[in-house]
Structure formats: C-alpha cells, structure tokens
C-alpha cells in the first residue's frame, strides 16, 4: 500500500448535486470551473512545499560545498606559496596537528514525528483522535499505559527490539558456556582423529603370495631359536641329544686357548664364596667357561632330560649377603692358599633398640655427662676400628641438684614463646559475613524488577542503530568479560 504524500483537492470536479435552477448547464460549467481553480490552488501550494524542501536541501548542500571550497583554498595557498628553503617547518608543529577524521552520521528515525512531512502531518490531523484512555493509567497496577492497549505506534519497534535483545543475550550465554567448557576441559580441542581403516597392509602382505601371509591371531609356526656357543643356531622344540652330532671342533689353524689350572686361580672373596657342596659344580662351570672350544661329553640316551649339548649352563644365582656377626665360610677345596689371607669381614655394630632415629628435639639446656652410658668396647686389634655408634635419643634431662643441700634448682626458662597456646577468638559476625554465607549456602536473593528495568533502559539505547551496533559488537567480540547487563543467571525470582 503506497503512502500518498499529497492529495490534490477536490478530487472530483462534476460530482455534485445541482440546485433547483433553470439553467442547469451554465450552473454545471461554473461548478466545474471553480473546482479546477481550486485544484490549481492546491497544486500551487504543493509545488511551494516541494520547491521549499528542495531549496532547503540545496542550501544545506551549498553551505557544505562553500566550507570545503574555503578549506581547499587555504590548503592551496599553503602548498603553492610555501618555500621550504626560507621557512622551516618544525617536527613538533607537524606532530601537534590532528589528523583528519571523518564523522559518519547514521541516518535513522526516518519516519519519526519530527521528520514527518507537512502534507502527511495534515493528513494525519484529519484522522479521528483516539479515546482518552490515558486517564486510566494511574489506576493500573502494572505501570503500563492504558492507551497502548488501544493503539501503540511503537509496538513493532518494541517487538523488534525485544527480539534483538534476546538474540544478543543468547549469544552471550552461548559464549560463556563455551568459555566455561574450555576452562573445565582445556584438552578438548586436542582430540586425536580416528585412524582411517584401509586394506593397504593386507594387500601388501598378499602381493608376495598367499602362502607367505601370517595371521596375527595364530601363533608363529617357527619355534624360537637359540644360539650355540660356537655360533650355530638351534631350535628349542623337539631337541634330542642322541640325534644330533657333536658340534664341530675348532680349526687347527687358530691358536689353542690357554688353559688355566685350578691351583693358579685367585681365591674368591668371602662375600661371593660358594659353599662346600657346590665345589664340584663350580669346577665344572669354570672348566666350561675357561675352555669353550672343547665340546662337552654327550649324555647317555637313556638318561633323564637335562641340559642340551652345546648349551652354556645358566649362571648360578648370586649368594646371599653375609650375615652380621657370622664368620666367613671357608674357601672351597683346591682354591685355598695359606699365603693369601681372606679379606676381613665387615665390622659388626652393637645392636640398637631404635632402628629409625626420631627427629632431633631442641637441645636441652644442661646435660650431665656423668649420666651418659660408657662407650662400647673396641674390637680386636686385627680388625679395623668401628665408627662411633649413633648417640641414643636424648630423654628428659635429669633435674640438676644445687650442691649438697639436695634442693632442686629452679627449672630452666622456656626456649621460646612459640609453645604458648594462642587464644582463639570467635569470628566477628556482621551483616557482610551473613550475606556472604547466605550466598554460599545457595540462598537466592530477590531481584528488584523496577531497578533492573531502569538499568536496562539506561544502558541500552532506544534506537535501531544502537541496538544493531550492540549486537554486532557482541557477535564479533572475543572479550573474556562475563559480567554483562544481559546476564540473567546471577539473579532469580
């Protein structure tokens, strides 16, 4: 529906009733001529309005052009007539000048009452006035105007404004939710993508032939292999000593390895000596280790399964450490030498009832050295002198006597004042602490509706440009400030 700005009156020239006259034709001609003259008068009036508006706009445009022309003239004089050789322009004078900055004026409220054209205003004034419902506004409890229930020119604007503010609020809540999730789970964005399953490995295995493909679920068909002492490789499964020939002898070209007699070997230390019943076993192990080129004798066929031929016997487990206060075991037969004495055993320490020393308490004020126990007796001259034993934990100091009177002396003064118990005062309760405790316990405060509405009206502008700019700023901003006038989560009814 187009908005008619100007209507030429009268619209109809000949639609009138004729009076009771004899000359009807002459009367009709006069009425039509009068209506044409009235239309010409209305047209001239509207032409004046149109040209008046054009004159106002042209005058504004001319004033802007004249101001720009004056600035251009001043700049032209400075540019063309300035001689840099004669007049020096200081750097300070250049920096003190402000740079040009254009001020953009947004065109809004195009259909406001102030911008209403005069013809439209005249058309509006011809309409019927609304009923005086504003007289009932003081009697309403909700504070709304009674006339707005009958006619509300700002209804569509308020509806659009409410929708824009709700969208802005939802955007801010969504951003706060994302920030909270990101803060709670910082590694959320570093999720490893799922590996794409392809049959490339399967085809790579099958390109050499189906018989070479090994299944991962089935165990390997090949038994584990073992390496002999002479470098040959053997298998663990189904090894029979009688079916295998002895390993080949070493080449005659290589020099024979030197053989050592048991008498020339040095005696083992006392900590790693073997017991007497293992001498024969130790001798066999040494002989197999010293001369690896000699093959061991083949076991009989009917014997019980034992170590396989060509295999080195497993090393003996390490002997237990020597016990305290026990003499070292005698060396095995054949290895002892009277000229080489065994190393001395580690010195034995006197047993102490407390294995873990408690943390040292503060030193006592006075200790009578006569009450300390005597030091332990030293070892024999042949052994090394043992280190001094750890001191016993100090007990309560004995009360010192003052001379022969037998009277107890005064107790020593305390070491520091830190041992005094501190007096615990009850916390001072005031209105602030009570309010804070109420908030922490989850009590919800009642929100003042009128105050919140007034704050929203003060903060949010009541025009289209301000609302749109606010929404754009919220959408494209990365601010971490969670406090906002749109935050409704902090208060609840």
UniProtKB/Swiss-Prot annotation:
Signal peptide: none annotated. It is found in: Cytoplasm, Cytoskeleton; Cell projection, Lamellipodium; Basolateral cell membrane. InterPro entries: SCAR/WAVE_fam, WH2_dom. Residues 211-220 have a biased composition (Basic and acidic residues). One of its GO terms (cellular component) is ruffle. Its main location: cytoplasm. The keyword tRNA processing does not apply. Downstream effector molecule involved in the transmission of signals from tyrosine kinase receptors and small GTPases to the actin cytoskeleton. Promotes formation of actin filaments. Part of the WAVE complex that regulates lamellipodia formation. The WAVE complex regulates actin filament reorganization via its interaction with the Arp2/3 complex. Binds actin and the Arp2/3 complex. Interacts with BAIAP2. Component of the WAVE2 complex composed of ABI1, CYFIP1/SRA1, NCKAP1/NAP1 (NCKAP1l/HEM1 in hematopoietic cells) and WASF2/WAVE2. Directly interacts with BRK1. Interacts with human cytomegalovirus protein UL135. Interacts with FNBP1L (via the SH3 domain). Binds and activates the Arp2/3 complex via the C-terminal domain. Interacts with actin via the WH2 domain. Belongs to the SCAR/WAVE family. This is Actin-binding protein WASF2. It comes from Bos taurus. The gene is WASF2.
